[in-house]
Amino acid sequence: MPNHVSRRRQLTVRYTLASALLLAAASAAVLALRRKPKPYVPGQENKDITHELDRAVPAGYPAAVQFTNVAEQAGINFRHFQGKRSTQLPEDMGSGAAWGDYDGDGYPDLFIADIAAPMTASPAELAASPGGNRLYHNNRNGTFTDVTAASGVDYKGLCNGAAWADYDNDGKLDLVVTCYDHIILYHNRGDGTFEDVSHKAGLDGFRGFWTGASWGDYDRDGNVDLYICGYVKYKYDATLAGKTSRQFTEMVPYMLNPSSFPPERNLLFHNNGNGTFTEVGKKAGVDDTTGRSLNAAWCDFDGDGWPDLYVANDISENKLYLNLHNGRFKDISEKAWVNEYRGSMGLAVGDWDRDGDPDIFITHWVAQGYALFSNLRYNRGITADPAN
């Protein structure tokens, strides 16, 4: 996801509820009970974008769980974008990563997507770049070995996201990688190597600024389908390179501002069960042509046994699509109170309050805070059907 620091103002969301108490953490917005939250107002200001980012944990604060960075000791020597960055938006994306036990030894391995070189790099410069995607094999002793070249997943480009899934039901995890202007599907041969089957599968003909990827069997036919997030319709214009454009209340470099460009559509690839896919995003109603999408997650949010879809969008409203069980979806974002308008980046789904239904956690752009949406379906005995 985007990782540069511009001057976006801190933005907050306030949700007021009639019969519940709202507990506001320093960087979280919690959706609770009964009454629809107040709308989000872009442009709410704080002192500046980073003035509170380096706050230390208060002395004596209990730390039940602590993490230590062991990347170097573990052999994860990855460095994102080993090149000189310009003010072009595709160069400003962070590294996507995905865990998956591709060799079936019971230990998860790690794939990291990378921007190998600047957009202006020549083919020779790109080939000579030390950057590029990486696959780290888990050695089962706390360390990893870089097996990128030997495995055949050493593509060099401007890559953003990745996701593992067994798309052909052969018992081995395959890998999809999203890039600027490219979608790659790697088939797992079962011997530690992968084959690029993007053309054979029908994925290589789609050009766009592709970011997040999420696998899910939305039609429950036993074959996992693929959702791809599109960011913006980016086009470099040298005449605008030195200019600025508005982002919320701020003026930022034009070519670095996602608000300068119209949203890219999202793609839904239906798995045909024979190693190929058919793109049905518009037909299914999930192409989200108004969202600058960075992440998506499949989950059965309403408990009907069918996977629904949540999409996290940057500088555009997030979307929640309800599965209608007929290959189509209904946009219930507003009725479900989850269509917030911020710089949504990371997305995770889980039952944080252990009440039996999945909740949504979203990370946002610098100093915009995080959001935790609590699913009301089983909250205090209330069954909330957002479709009604």
What is each of the regions a protein language model found here?
Residues 1-388:
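Acidic, glycine/proline-rich Ca2+-coordinating loop motifs
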